[in-house]
């Protein structure tokens, strides 16, 4: 079986909820999966008891998956999936740079913007694909146990655009693993469309400490969410992003209504008093706004509140 002979390296860091979902599905469908995490308890639980995934896909414990805290064990894989938080992408890329990746593909899937730029600081990007997880919401319930609220589509594309044979191969692998996946000619469009949704909910949910549905059930919180998204949309328009929608407000509300119980990963980080992905999401709107001379008052305030709170528990 071609699936059984295919090696897949699933690379993710501590509290790797999304990486756990990905790895579980690939292993369940007979791919050879080795996960990397720096969290000893999570790795030990996976190796001793298997990886439990509960949620929209049911409740299943996958015993065929393996995990390690030793990055060098990931050598000689066909596919590396970087499912870390955005600020850890550079660290992973710096370690991958020591491997021979001439016949491998690196697929990086993050919230926000800037993953490709972080990777290219440490390694060439000709073998790097970009991915967007659409309609996913995941969290770690305990070591060895991941939960997910949604699972719509894995969208994948070449950094420089276009449809290629290798893109088709990777998309087919995701399909074989049980995901809905599709290759796109313009991945930047999709990254920006996901970015706008992240901006709409990550920051506001973290500031108000509410789920997406709770934000949408309050007109004042919804207004903050919408205005954050509109600021991001304006920047995308200036960057000539070819958006698939005109009505940004409707787009983000429709997106949110599909996962009302979800807590964005930024809120999960805030609640757990961990460093969050602010600089890649709402903070990125502020950064790009300064570069393009566009005022971003809603994202500026949201970012300042989250940053100020973060200083209280991260020294």
Model regions and ranges:
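Single conserved hydrophobic/aromatic residue that forms the stacking wall/gate
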Residues: 1-12
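NAD(P)+-binding Rossmann beta1-loop-alpha1 motif at the extreme N-terminus of oxidoreductases
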Residues: 10-59
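Short, well-ordered alpha-helices that flank and scaffold nucleotide-derived cofactor binding pockets
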Residues: 24, 28, 94-98, 121, ...
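Rossmann-like NAD(P)(H) cofactor-binding subdomain of soluble oxidoreductases
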Residues: 36, 60-145
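Short alpha-helical
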Residues: 41, 87-88, 113-114, 162, ...
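Internal alpha-helical scaffold of NAD(P)-dependent oxidoreductase catalytic cores
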Residues: 99, 122-127, 142-245
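NAD(P)-dependent Rossmann-like dehydrogenase/reductase catalytic/cofactor-binding core
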Residues: 176, 224-315
